[in-house]
Protein backbone atom coordinates (compact mmCIF):
# COMPACT_ATOMS: atom_id res chain seq x y z
CA UNK A 1 0.00 0.00 0.00
CA UNK A 2 1.06 3.57 -0.55
CA UNK A 3 2.88 5.21 2.34
CA UNK A 4 0.91 8.09 3.82
CA UNK A 5 3.86 9.54 5.70
CA UNK A 6 7.55 10.06 5.04
CA UNK A 7 9.02 9.57 8.52
CA UNK A 8 7.19 8.47 11.63
CA UNK A 9 8.66 8.35 15.14
CA UNK A 10 7.29 5.82 17.64
CA UNK A 11 7.96 6.78 21.27
CA UNK A 12 7.75 4.32 24.14
CA UNK A 13 8.81 3.86 27.77
CA UNK A 14 10.30 0.57 28.98
CA UNK A 15 7.73 0.63 31.78
CA UNK A 16 4.79 1.41 29.54
CA UNK A 17 2.31 -0.91 31.22
CA UNK A 18 2.73 -3.72 28.68
CA UNK A 19 4.03 -6.98 30.12
CA UNK A 20 6.55 -7.36 27.31
CA UNK A 21 7.31 -3.99 25.74
CA UNK A 22 9.73 -5.41 23.15
CA UNK A 23 7.11 -7.85 21.94
CA UNK A 24 4.59 -5.01 21.89
CA UNK A 25 6.90 -2.87 19.76
CA UNK A 26 7.20 -5.72 17.28
CA UNK A 27 3.44 -6.15 17.13
CA UNK A 28 2.73 -2.51 16.28
CA UNK A 29 5.56 -1.82 13.84
CA UNK A 30 4.11 -4.10 11.15
CA UNK A 31 1.13 -1.81 10.62
CA UNK A 32 2.95 1.46 11.28
CA UNK A 33 5.74 0.70 8.82
CA UNK A 34 3.11 0.13 6.13
CA UNK A 35 2.03 3.79 6.32
CA UNK A 36 5.49 5.31 6.87
CA UNK A 37 8.39 5.15 4.43
CA UNK A 38 10.73 5.42 7.40
CA UNK A 39 9.78 4.48 10.97
CA UNK A 40 12.08 5.38 13.87
CA UNK A 41 11.56 3.60 17.20
CA UNK A 42 12.59 5.84 20.07
CA UNK A 43 12.97 4.63 23.66
CA UNK A 44 12.34 7.23 26.35
CA UNK A 45 14.55 6.19 29.26
CA UNK A 46 13.75 9.02 31.66
CA UNK A 47 10.84 11.29 32.37
CA UNK A 48 11.17 14.38 30.20
CA UNK A 49 13.04 12.62 27.38
CA UNK A 50 10.05 12.77 25.01
CA UNK A 51 9.80 16.54 25.51
CA UNK A 52 13.51 16.86 24.63
CA UNK A 53 13.02 14.75 21.50
CA UNK A 54 10.13 17.03 20.49
CA UNK A 55 12.49 20.00 20.78
CA UNK A 56 15.01 18.21 18.54
CA UNK A 57 12.31 17.37 16.00
CA UNK A 58 11.18 21.01 15.91
CA UNK A 59 14.77 22.17 15.35
CA UNK A 60 15.23 19.48 12.64
CA UNK A 61 18.10 18.08 14.71
CA UNK A 62 16.42 14.69 15.20
CA UNK A 63 15.66 14.33 11.49
CA UNK A 64 14.62 16.75 8.78
CA UNK A 65 11.59 14.86 7.48
CA UNK A 66 9.51 13.76 10.51
CA UNK A 67 5.83 14.21 9.64
CA UNK A 68 3.98 12.01 12.15
CA UNK A 69 4.43 10.89 15.76
CA UNK A 70 3.22 7.72 17.49
CA UNK A 71 3.14 6.97 21.20
CA UNK A 72 2.81 3.54 22.82
CA UNK A 73 1.90 3.89 26.48
CA UNK A 74 -0.60 4.88 29.13
CA UNK A 75 -2.10 8.26 29.91
CA UNK A 76 1.07 9.49 31.64
CA UNK A 77 3.26 8.73 28.61
CA UNK A 78 0.72 10.30 26.28
CA UNK A 79 0.63 13.36 28.52
CA UNK A 80 4.40 13.79 28.18
CA UNK A 81 4.15 13.75 24.38
CA UNK A 82 1.26 16.25 24.44
CA UNK A 83 3.41 18.57 26.57
CA UNK A 84 6.34 18.17 24.17
CA UNK A 85 4.23 18.90 21.10
CA UNK A 86 2.49 21.90 22.67
CA UNK A 87 5.62 23.38 24.29
CA UNK A 88 7.60 23.23 21.06
CA UNK A 89 4.69 24.00 18.71
CA UNK A 90 5.01 20.83 16.66
CA UNK A 91 2.29 20.89 14.02
CA UNK A 92 2.37 17.12 13.52
CA UNK A 93 -0.37 14.49 13.78
CA UNK A 94 -0.17 11.99 16.65
CA UNK A 95 -1.26 8.36 16.70
CA UNK A 96 -1.94 6.99 20.20
CA UNK A 97 -1.46 3.26 20.85
CA UNK A 98 -2.81 2.12 24.25
CA UNK A 99 -0.14 0.58 26.42
CA UNK A 100 -1.08 1.38 29.99
CA UNK A 101 -3.72 0.83 32.62
CA UNK A 102 -6.08 3.39 31.18
CA UNK A 103 -6.17 5.30 27.95
CA UNK A 104 -9.22 7.45 28.46
CA UNK A 105 -8.69 9.66 25.45
CA UNK A 106 -8.28 6.73 23.06
CA UNK A 107 -11.93 5.90 23.78
CA UNK A 108 -12.82 9.38 22.53
CA UNK A 109 -10.81 8.64 19.36
CA UNK A 110 -12.56 5.24 18.91
CA UNK A 111 -9.19 3.49 19.16
CA UNK A 112 -9.15 -0.15 20.26
CA UNK A 113 -7.77 -0.86 23.77
CA UNK A 114 -5.38 -3.49 22.35
CA UNK A 115 -2.14 -1.97 21.05
CA UNK A 116 -1.86 -4.32 18.03
CA UNK A 117 -5.44 -3.68 16.93
CA UNK A 118 -4.91 0.04 17.49
CA UNK A 119 -1.83 0.02 15.25
CA UNK A 120 -3.87 -1.61 12.48
CA UNK A 121 -6.52 1.08 12.87
CA UNK A 122 -3.87 3.73 12.22
CA UNK A 123 -3.74 2.61 8.58
CA UNK A 124 -7.19 4.04 7.81
CA UNK A 125 -7.49 6.58 10.64
CA UNK A 126 -8.13 10.22 9.78
CA UNK A 127 -6.58 13.27 11.40
CA UNK A 128 -8.93 15.13 13.76
CA UNK A 129 -8.32 18.43 15.53
CA UNK A 130 -8.88 18.60 19.30
CA UNK A 131 -8.83 21.10 22.14
CA UNK A 132 -6.10 21.00 24.79
CA UNK A 133 -6.20 22.08 28.44
CA UNK A 134 -3.48 24.45 29.65
CA UNK A 135 -2.85 24.31 33.41
CA UNK A 136 -0.34 26.97 34.48
CA UNK A 137 2.53 26.03 32.14
CA UNK A 138 1.53 22.42 31.55
CA UNK A 139 -0.84 20.80 29.07
CA UNK A 140 -3.33 17.95 29.18
CA UNK A 141 -5.82 16.26 26.88
CA UNK A 142 -8.41 14.93 29.26
CA UNK A 143 -8.92 16.35 32.74
CA UNK A 144 -7.70 18.32 35.75
CA UNK A 145 -8.89 17.25 39.20
CA UNK A 146 -8.29 17.67 42.90
CA UNK A 147 -9.62 16.19 46.10
CA UNK A 148 -10.84 12.60 46.03
CA UNK A 149 -9.46 11.95 42.54
CA UNK A 150 -5.95 12.77 43.82
CA UNK A 151 -6.41 10.46 46.80
CA UNK A 152 -7.36 7.78 44.31
CA UNK A 153 -4.31 8.40 42.13
CA UNK A 154 -2.06 8.17 45.18
CA UNK A 155 -3.74 4.90 46.15
CA UNK A 156 -3.02 3.54 42.68
CA UNK A 157 0.63 4.57 42.94
CA UNK A 158 0.76 2.70 46.24
CA UNK A 159 -0.64 -0.39 44.53
CA UNK A 160 -4.02 -0.10 46.20
CA UNK A 161 -7.38 -0.49 44.53
CA UNK A 162 -8.18 2.04 41.81
CA UNK A 163 -11.64 3.20 42.75
CA UNK A 164 -12.01 5.44 39.75
CA UNK A 165 -10.88 2.63 37.50
CA UNK A 166 -13.89 0.61 38.58
CA UNK A 167 -16.55 3.27 38.67
CA UNK A 168 -19.33 0.70 38.66
CA UNK A 169 -18.25 -0.15 42.21
CA UNK A 170 -17.60 3.37 43.36
CA UNK A 171 -20.77 3.65 45.45
CA UNK A 172 -19.58 0.92 47.79
CA UNK A 173 -15.82 1.33 47.36
CA UNK A 174 -15.80 5.00 48.25
CA UNK A 175 -17.18 4.12 51.67
CA UNK A 176 -13.87 2.38 52.35
CA UNK A 177 -12.15 5.69 51.66
CA UNK A 178 -13.98 7.36 54.50
CA UNK A 179 -13.48 10.98 55.50
CA UNK A 180 -12.12 12.33 52.22
CA UNK A 181 -10.39 15.66 52.70
CA UNK A 182 -12.75 18.62 52.77
CA UNK A 183 -11.33 21.86 51.42
CA UNK A 184 -12.48 25.41 50.81
CA UNK A 185 -12.33 26.70 47.26
CA UNK A 186 -12.53 29.99 45.40
CA UNK A 187 -13.32 29.40 41.74
CA UNK A 188 -13.57 31.84 38.85
CA UNK A 189 -14.99 30.56 35.56
CA UNK A 190 -15.25 33.10 32.72
CA UNK A 191 -15.36 35.93 35.29
CA UNK A 192 -18.14 34.37 37.37
CA UNK A 193 -17.10 33.42 40.90
CA UNK A 194 -18.01 30.42 43.02
CA UNK A 195 -16.92 29.47 46.53
CA UNK A 196 -17.66 26.88 49.17
CA UNK A 197 -16.48 23.60 50.66
CA UNK A 198 -16.11 20.39 48.69
CA UNK A 199 -14.26 17.07 48.47
CA UNK A 200 -13.59 17.04 44.72
CA UNK A 201 -13.43 19.42 41.76
CA UNK A 202 -12.97 18.16 38.22
CA UNK A 203 -12.51 20.05 34.93
CA UNK A 204 -12.94 17.77 31.92
CA UNK A 205 -12.11 18.16 28.24
CA UNK A 206 -12.78 14.58 27.16
CA UNK A 207 -15.91 12.56 27.99
CA UNK A 208 -14.14 9.56 29.58
CA UNK A 209 -12.53 9.44 33.02
CA UNK A 210 -11.30 6.25 34.69
CA UNK A 211 -12.65 4.18 31.83
CA UNK A 212 -16.24 5.37 32.18
CA UNK A 213 -18.16 8.00 30.29
CA UNK A 214 -19.37 11.19 31.95
CA UNK A 215 -23.12 11.18 31.27
CA UNK A 216 -23.38 14.45 29.36
CA UNK A 217 -24.38 14.19 25.72
CA UNK A 218 -22.85 17.53 24.74
CA UNK A 219 -19.43 17.06 26.36
CA UNK A 220 -16.87 17.21 23.55
CA UNK A 221 -13.13 17.87 23.29
CA UNK A 222 -13.80 19.78 20.07
CA UNK A 223 -16.23 22.44 21.34
CA UNK A 224 -13.79 25.03 22.72
CA UNK A 225 -15.09 24.60 26.27
CA UNK A 226 -14.18 22.78 29.47
CA UNK A 227 -16.73 21.29 31.84
CA UNK A 228 -16.12 21.83 35.56
CA UNK A 229 -17.87 19.67 38.17
CA UNK A 230 -18.05 20.52 41.87
CA UNK A 231 -19.00 17.55 44.07
CA UNK A 232 -20.62 18.16 47.42
CA UNK A 233 -20.10 15.89 50.40
CA UNK A 234 -23.37 14.04 49.87
CA UNK A 235 -22.65 13.20 46.24
CA UNK A 236 -20.68 9.97 46.83
CA UNK A 237 -23.85 7.95 47.26
CA UNK A 238 -25.01 8.97 43.80
CA UNK A 239 -21.72 8.63 41.93
CA UNK A 240 -22.43 4.96 41.44
CA UNK A 241 -25.77 5.72 39.80
CA UNK A 242 -24.31 8.48 37.63
CA UNK A 243 -21.62 6.38 36.02
CA UNK A 244 -23.87 3.38 35.49
CA UNK A 245 -26.27 5.47 33.42
CA UNK A 246 -26.24 5.74 29.66
CA UNK A 247 -24.74 8.86 28.14
CA UNK A 248 -28.14 9.96 26.81
CA UNK A 249 -29.37 10.91 30.24
CA UNK A 250 -30.13 14.43 31.38
CA UNK A 251 -27.59 15.58 33.97
CA UNK A 252 -30.22 17.59 35.82
CA UNK A 253 -32.33 14.47 36.32
CA UNK A 254 -29.72 12.63 38.35
CA UNK A 255 -28.39 14.94 40.98
CA UNK A 256 -28.38 18.28 42.63
CA UNK A 257 -25.25 17.22 44.52
CA UNK A 258 -22.92 17.91 41.60
CA UNK A 259 -22.68 21.37 40.08
CA UNK A 260 -21.77 21.52 36.39
CA UNK A 261 -20.28 24.74 34.98
CA UNK A 262 -19.04 25.01 31.37
CA UNK A 263 -16.40 27.62 30.61
CA UNK A 264 -13.17 28.56 28.86
CA UNK A 265 -10.98 30.22 31.52
CA UNK A 266 -10.76 28.99 35.11
CA UNK A 267 -8.85 30.17 38.17
CA UNK A 268 -8.86 28.08 41.33
CA UNK A 269 -7.50 28.65 44.82
CA UNK A 270 -8.00 26.38 47.83
CA UNK A 271 -7.49 26.34 51.56
CA UNK A 272 -5.51 24.30 52.39
CA UNK A 273 -3.24 23.96 49.36
CA UNK A 274 -4.27 20.88 47.36
CA UNK A 275 -2.38 18.57 45.01
CA UNK A 276 -3.65 18.53 41.43
CA UNK A 277 -4.11 15.46 39.19
CA UNK A 278 -3.51 16.14 35.49
CA UNK A 279 -4.46 13.14 33.33
CA UNK A 280 -3.36 10.79 36.11
CA UNK A 281 -0.12 12.62 36.92
CA UNK A 282 0.16 14.54 40.20
CA UNK A 283 2.55 17.34 39.35
CA UNK A 284 1.03 20.62 40.54
CA UNK A 285 -0.56 22.22 43.57
CA UNK A 286 -3.15 24.96 43.90
CA UNK A 287 -3.52 27.78 43.04
CA UNK A 288 -3.93 26.99 39.34
CA UNK A 289 -5.07 28.79 36.20
CA UNK A 290 -6.77 26.65 33.58
CA UNK A 291 -7.81 27.49 30.04
CA UNK A 292 -8.92 25.63 26.96
CA UNK A 293 -6.85 26.04 23.79
CA UNK A 294 -9.22 25.29 20.90
CA UNK A 295 -8.14 23.23 17.89
CA UNK A 296 -4.66 22.87 19.35
CA UNK A 297 -3.60 19.34 18.45
CA UNK A 298 -3.96 16.81 15.64
CA UNK A 299 -4.81 13.23 16.63
CA UNK A 300 -5.44 10.18 14.47
CA UNK A 301 -9.10 9.30 14.87
CA UNK A 302 -10.99 6.16 13.87
CA UNK A 303 -14.29 6.88 12.20
CA UNK A 304 -17.19 5.88 14.44
CA UNK A 305 -19.01 3.16 12.52
From Swiss-Prot:
Binds 1 Mg(2+) ion per subunit. This ion appears to have a structural role and is required for catalytic activity. GO terms for cellular component: plasma membrane. Coiled coil: none annotated. InterPro entries: ATP-NAD_kinase_N, Diacylglycerol/lipid_kinase, Diacylglycerol_kinase_cat_dom, Lipid_Phosphate_FormReg, NAD/diacylglycerol_kinase_sf, YegS/DAGK_C. Disulfide bonds: none annotated. ATP binds at residues 44, 74-80, 101. GO terms for molecular function: ATP binding; ATP-dependent diacylglycerol kinase activity; metal ion binding. The keyword DNA-binding does not apply. GO terms for biological process: phospholipid biosynthetic process. Its cofactor is Mg(2+). Keywords: ATP-binding, Kinase, Lipid biosynthesis, Lipid metabolism, Magnesium, Metal-binding, Nucleotide-binding, Phospholipid biosynthesis, Phospholipid metabolism, Transferase. Mg(2+) binds at residues 220, 223, 225. Belongs to the diacylglycerol/lipid kinase family. May catalyze the ATP-dependent phosphorylation of lipids other than diacylglycerol (DAG). In fact, is not able to exhibit diacylglycerol kinase activity in vitro. NCBIfam families: YegS/Rv2252/BmrU family lipid kinase. This is Putative lipid kinase SAR0780.
Amino acid sequence: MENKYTHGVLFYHEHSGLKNINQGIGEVTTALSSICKHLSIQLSENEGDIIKYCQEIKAKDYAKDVDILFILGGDGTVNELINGVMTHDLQLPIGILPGGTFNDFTKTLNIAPNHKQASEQMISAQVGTYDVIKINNQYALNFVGLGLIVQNAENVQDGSKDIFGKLSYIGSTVKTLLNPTQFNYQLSIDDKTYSGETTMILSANGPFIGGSRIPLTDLSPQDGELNTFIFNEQSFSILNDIFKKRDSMNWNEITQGIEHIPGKKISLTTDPTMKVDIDGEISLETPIDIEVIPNAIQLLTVNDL
